[in-house]
Amino acid sequence: AGFAGDDAPRAVFPSIVGRPRHTGVMVGMGQKDAYVGDEAQSKRGILSLKYPIEHGIVSNWDDMEKIWHHTFYNELRVVPEEHPVLLTEAPLNPKANREKMTQIMFETFNTPAMYVAIQAVLSLYASGRTTGIVMGSGDGVSHTVPIYEGYALPHAILRLDLAGRDLTDHLMKILTERGYSFTTTAEREIVRDVKEKLSYIAPDYEQEIIDTTSSSKTVEKTYELPDGQVITIGAERFRCPEVLFQPSIIGMEAAGIHETTYNSIMKCDVDIRKDLYGNIVLSGGTTMFPGIADRMSKEITALAPSSMKIKVVAPPERKYSVWIGGSILASLSTFQL
């Protein structure tokens, strides 16, 4: 969250609401009935954490309202009545959801005006393009969204219910095979941090497995847990995000992100495919793994016609490119609410 025209968000925090597991545990702390974002994160040991956004779509409106309240009053410190608001939504977000979002903004927060933009379109704007295909992957969902001259092509949007949270769960599982135990919601957050700091995508998965088992290449790294214990992580570093290209690893019958991107392009008019292949833009936190652009390029080249020029763009700021695109859009003079 932040202000139009800024080049980076003022506030970045997880969409989490935590409630005390036991009432009255925190004696003398003036216990609140709910904690949001980083505060929920830091007190996670005594809280039960909930995620009001599932697969990119809001599923718990009361908690979502708490998050927005926290954003306005605690993070940005603004009075919502005084500011037009730009919100973003997942591709193919149901109309009822958009209406509910609008209703809360106008009735609960009394915002003077609002606009809802599609996340992928904003990411594409942030990369300086108006035509291309965005492969966006966050915490709960991934989408491939072809965009032509600034407009998303709904018939060709594909959704893949595989994203950051699934990778964290998979890493929890494969670290358990190594003899470490991570089970609670609090421990899941530790594993998420391990994933973000140490994972990478192998250029060639099979070869990487061979190289690391034959010990010609060591990929082992250490990570210190909050309690001081040090764990070692090796092949898990690339086994975890490989799921993006091979969902079958976690028992999912779905196409990987490369094949989903290809399928999305194939649903578009034959005349615009060349423009899409040449402008594949990655966006979202789950595209932050080192090696992802090269691997994506290699996999799509194998699927596409041999003469096709393929370009995969992974902007360094892609974790926040949706927000940056929103900042650009909301500060345009043509965009007057």
UniProtKB/Swiss-Prot annotation:
Q: What is its EC number?
A: 3.6.4.-
Q: What class of enzyme is it?
A: hydrolase
**What PROSITE patterns does the annotation carry?**
ACTINS_1 (PS00406), ACTINS_ACT_LIKE (PS01132)
> What GO terms are given for molecular function?
ATP binding; hydrolase activity
Places the protein is found: Cytoplasm, Cytoskeleton
Catalytic activity field: ATP + H2O = ADP + phosphate + H(+)
* GO (cellular component) term, any one: cytoplasm
UniProt entry tagged with the keyword Cytoplasm:
yes
| UniProt KW keywords | ATP-binding, Cytoplasm, Cytoskeleton, Hydrolase, Nucleotide-binding
Q: Does the keyword Amino-acid biosynthesis apply?
A: no
Q: Where is the signal peptide?
A: none
Family under the similarity heading: Belongs to the actin family.
What is the recorded function of this protein according to its Swiss-Prot or TrEMBL entry? Answer: Actins are highly conserved proteins that are involved in various types of cell motility and are ubiquitously expressed in all eukaryotic cells. Essential component of cell cytoskeleton; plays an important role in cytoplasmic streaming, cell shape determination, cell division, organelle movement and extension growth.
What is the additional note? There are at least 13 actin genes in potato.
What protein name does the entry list? Answer: Actin-65
